[in-house]
Swiss-Prot record:
Upregulation: Expressed in the early phase of the viral replicative cycle.
Ligand binding (Ca(2+) 2): D202, D204, D253
Catalytic activity: RNA(n) + ATP = RNA(n)-3'-adenine ribonucleotide + diphosphate
Function summary: Polymerase that creates the 3'-poly(A) tail of mRNA's.
Binding site for Ca(2+) 1: D202, D204
Keywords: ATP-binding, Calcium, Early protein, Metal-binding, mRNA processing, Nucleotide-binding, Transcription, Transferase
Protein name from the UniProt record: Poly(A) polymerase catalytic subunit
GO MF annotation list: ATP binding; metal ion binding; poly(A) RNA polymerase activity
Gene that specifies this protein: OPG063
Length: 479
């Protein structure tokens, strides 16, 4: 049975803060559970809701003007959410409401509200690239890798896209300019900034405050549309979150990285936006072609990949002076797979100071072996490479999260061999090491190649963990 707390024995100020917030005298249990949240609760209580309503309306006018909703509906939704706690008696749900309201009152203005004020002048920094000259070369490279056999009986997961993506993209373009120290983009949109002929869907981003940003954005969409918005966390993707609507339609996703990782990611500046250096993106594309699913994507839409590949090839030609003459020297580097222990040995002595690289296909095994080495100098680049790297006694140790394709029993397919080489080169770029000669040889090794069928492939490392989510409507946070 709930009893009101004895006001003579409890701190009156804290009690009053909680009482004002709940719109009722708290029970003894509510008081003792919420008293440590008094500071956050007070910030929520004194928060100027009128200014917040005005900011959301301005965001709506600028980025969601085609959404049919009135100013009064937006205001009602906001005021309703900020009074939701008065009708909530479950302690867990109250904690969720306090946490999410706290994010809004402390961060929304700086993260999304700022997008409504006049922006700095855009510094035009585009270079004219002759992408057309690379299209035939890109097509030849991709054609030799178009070797996946599509299983028509295989049920593919559908990726439903929300109609709000175009609105969010418009917002993201401005967000990337205003927050270019903490948020950068990669993928199709970043290449579109170099080559306007590139088609893109949603905008792929890396940022240092992903969770806060996505919560603020989810509430903005909720207040404008009235839809229930859900944030999901996927266990096998590091520090990844996605916003979906109540019908499971994809709106936007984001990877979170540390600031020290952000600082070392190679990037270039275009129109006040930082994008991941296309050289780095090209290496990632080569690496990802070792993933059987990505080769299946290539088989379905080769022209989409061709436009991207040609753009990146032209960028590296222009930026690094790469000559495409077919001289590949020792590329791809020799790769020998131990299928039982799931380790690939790459001979690196022709290019780097370390003589070989041991590439683990199971991350937990690598972690265990690094502990056994008693070495504490490993580099973890989080979702940028999906791997740690360690150089110890002239040997590199790293993890490869993709499948390994085989062209025959026990023989690594050249597509995967190049992917492994690209994975090593990502480390070189991130640590400001030498990579240009190796890059030149790697790209030239992709020229004038015949198609080699896939004999089989290794399975990807299985990641443990559970899906997490934030359900705003139901006041649930599970992480």
């Amino acid at each position: 049975m709930n009893r009101n707390p004895d006001q003579n024995t409890l701190p009156n100020i804290t009690l009053k803060i909680i009482e004002t917030y709940l719109g009722r005298v708290p029970s003894v249990n509510e008081y003792h559970m919420l008293k440590l949240q008094a500071r956050n609760i007070q910030k929520i209580t004194v928060f100027n809701k009128d200014i917040f309503v005005s900011l959301v309306k301005k965001n709506k006018k600028r980025f969601f003007s085609d959404v049919n909703t009135s100013a009064s509906e937006i205001k009602d939704r906001i005021l309703s959410y900020f009074s939701k706690q008065t009708q909530t008696y479950n302690i867990g749900k109250l904690f969720t409401i306090i946490e999410l309201q706290s994010v809004l009152v402390t961060t929304y203005t700086d993260i999304l509200g700022v997008l409504t004020i006049k922006a700095p002048n855009v510094i035009s920094s585009k270079i004219s690239y002759n992408v057309t000259s690379m299209e035939e070369l890109a097509r030849d490279m991709l054609n030799s890798m178009n070797v996946a056999v599509i299983d028509k009986a295989k049920v593919m997961g559908r990726h439903n896209v929300s109609s709000l993506v175009k609105n969010v993209n418009k917002l993201m373009e401005e967000y990337l300019r205003r927050h270019n120290k903490s948020c950068i983009c990669y993928g199709s949109y970043s290449l579109y900034l170099i080559n306007p002929n590139i088609r893109y869907g949603d905008i792929d981003i890396l940022q240092t405050n992903s969770r806060t940003f996505l919560i603020d954005l989810a509430f903005l969409i909720k207040f404008i549309t009235g839809n229930n918005i859900i944030l999901s966390k996927i266990p096998y993707l590091r520090n990844y979150m996605v916003i979906k609507d109540e019908n499971d339609n994809h709106i936007i996703d984001s990877f979170n990285i540390r600031q020290d990782t952000m600082n070392v990611v190679p990037k270039i500046f275009i129109d006040n936006i930082y994008i991941v250096d296309p050289t780095f993106q090209l290496l990632n594309m080569i690496k990802m072609f070792s993933q059987i699913d990505r080769l299946e994507d290539l088989s379905k839409d080769p022209e989409k990949f061709n436009a991207r590949m040609a753009t990146m090839l032209e960028y590296v030609r222009y930026t690094h002076g790469i000559v495409f003459d077919g001289k590949r020297n020792n590329m791809p580097m020799k790769c020998i797979i131990d299928e039982n222990n799931r380790i690939v040995t790459v001979t690196t002595k022709d290019y780097f100071s370390f003589k070989k690289c041991l590439v683990y296909l199971d991350e937990n095994v690598l972690s265990s072996d690094i502990l056994d080495l008693n070495a504490d100098t490993s580099c973890d680049f989080e979702s940028v490479t999906n791997s740690v790297y360690l150089i110890h006694d002239n040997i590199m140790y790293t993890y490869f999260s993709n499948t390994i394709l085989l062209s025959d029993k026990g023989k690594v397919h050249e597509i995967s061999a190049r992917g492994l080489c690209a994975h090593i080169l990502l480390y070189q770029m991130l640590t400001s090491g030498e990579y240009k000669q190796c890059l030149s040889d790697l790209l030239n090794s992709m020229m004038n190649r015949d198609k080699i069928p896939i004999y089989s492939h290794t399975e990807r490392d299985k990641k443990p963990g559970r899906h997490g989510f934030i359900n705003i409507e139901k006041d649930i946070i599970v992480f």
